[in-house]
Amino acid sequence: MKHKVKHVHFVGIGGSGMSGIAEVLLNLGFSVSGSDLADNATTRRLAGFGAKLYQGHAAEHLGESDVVVISSAVKDDNPEVVAARERNIPIIPRALMLAELMRFRQGIAIAGTHGKTTTTSLIASILAEAGMDPTFVIGGRLEASGSNARLGTGEYIVAEADESDASFLHLTPIISVVTNIDADHMDTYGHDFERLKGAFVEFLQRLPFYGMAVVCIDDPNVRAILPQISKQVMPYGFSEEARIRASNVQAENGRMHFTVTRINGVTTTFDVTLNLPGRHYVLNALAAIAVASELNVPDGAIIKALAEFKGVGRRFERYGEVPARDGGYFTLVDDYGHHPAEMNAVIAAARDAFPGRRLVLAFQPHRYTRTRDCFEDFVKVLSSADVVLLTEVYAAGEAPIVAADGRSLVRAIRVAGKVEPLFVETPQELPQSILDMAQDGDVVIVMGAGSIGQVAARTKEMAEVAEHVPMEAVR
């Protein structure tokens, strides 16, 4: 690629998937530029590596670009896309650039509606512990490296495979993981769940004859597509059919202890401690163990990496104990969960990790279409918290949909009668609302995928200021 392409421009460079690819390209020696609507820690990091960044979108930002990479959120009428089209500069989706990177290494691609980021991070951490120095591109910040991407010297590249726009079908990995299949991003698939499942079948069928499909046998939709898969399959899960199986699962102090049974020619067992809470994370760890086993990683490296795993940014990220107004302390957690299934798993993990404590959930819905399609499920999962603070929907470029907004959710939760929700106009107001409400011993979870990402940090900052200054002085 490099003899023809020297300058790569990213439209929407601040997104987690885009920024990771940009960072790898910078480390490979390419000239990188990009634009986004707002400056953030990710764009500042890329600027530190030498990327030329622009706030906002304009045709002149293209400069001498040889190719333009766009995220699925970028529209056809974006001025940079229009200018690239007029100048006959190739315009490619993010996944196609990721596929180009994967061509020169052995690819491990992780797909699924939920759990992609954590599973990808666990695999990268295990391979790093084994001395295999992988390249990785992750949809969140891997705390151990402080980044969502890294160019390694090893032969493997570990990356998330995005089904939201079906672009994961561009990838050509040697190992493909499917964590689960759920009804999300249904606009892409014409609101036809069978089409969505068919895309996952095609994703797995793109494996070479020597490739391996690592799949969660516990997920009913994954199980349903297995008869259509002609490649080698490594099923994992809690069920007896799993060849990588967890048993004796116990939660303790925010960690999970379990026994792994691996059936791969011979049967072996070993005990694991995972430095994350929740059974859903155990499933993610089993996927990582399956991949590592396929690559002949020693069990010692697997055990050590899982026990020492430092987590991923905004995936049950713990901010520690935060001062409450009543003189005590509450536990603050930040999470990216934005689909009811993910939220339910996070709440269950919090109940296991902090039994008997009041659970306060501050949530920003993401996309009007998802809110509409999963409305009743959102009402149910939000009603399972003890206290609910809800903001308006983060549009992600979508037009508002009647009866699929934040206030409609609040009304429906109130009618359900299990909890009295509080509507907070904007995420910027959430930190103060949380501090007004949180009590000693509470567990406060800030959750969502939109503009809520800085709320937990701001809440902690304001609480620590208020601990030393009368609250009236900081209002």
Swiss-Prot record:
Predominant localisation class: cytoplasm
Q: Which SUPFAM superfamilies match?
A: MurCD N-terminal domain, MurD-like peptide ligases, catalytic domain, MurD-like peptide ligases, peptide-binding domain
Please name the Pfam families in this protein's record.
Mur_ligase, Mur_ligase_C, Mur_ligase_M
Q: Which residues bind ATP?
A: G112, T113, H114, G115, K116, T117, T118
A GO biological process this protein is involved in?
regulation of cell shape
What's an example of a GO molecular-function annotation for this chain? ATP binding
Reactions accelerated catalytically: UDP-N-acetyl-alpha-D-muramate + L-alanine + ATP = UDP-N-acetyl-alpha-D-muramoyl-L-alanine + ADP + phosphate + H(+)
Q: NCBIfam families in the record, alphabetically?
A: murC
- Purpose of the protein: Cell wall formation.
This one is known as UDP-N-acetylmuramate--L-alanine ligase
Q: What species was this sequence derived from?
A: Methylobacillus flagellatus (strain ATCC 51484 / DSM 6875 / VKM B-1610 / KT)
The root-end lineage is: Bacteria, Pseudomonadati, Pseudomonadota, Betaproteobacteria, Nitrosomonadales
